[in-house]
Curated annotation (Swiss-Prot):
Encoding gene per record: psaL
GO BP annotations, alphabetical order: photosynthesis
Compartment(s) of residence: Cellular thylakoid membrane
Keyword line: Membrane, Photosynthesis, Photosystem I, Thylakoid, Transmembrane
Protein name: Photosystem I reaction center subunit XI
Annotated spans, Disordered: 1-20
Family membership noted in the UniProt record: Belongs to the PsaL family.
Source organism per UniProt: Thermostichus vulcanus
Signal peptide: none
Length: 20
């Protein structure tokens, strides 16, 4: 939701923010 990181939750925008 901040910067483009690795798509953990399938979303590149919620990468490091939405870790499973």
């Amino acid at each position: 939701a901040e910067e483009l990181v690795k798509p953990y939750n399938g979303d590149p925008f919620v990468g490091h923010l939405s870790t499973p």
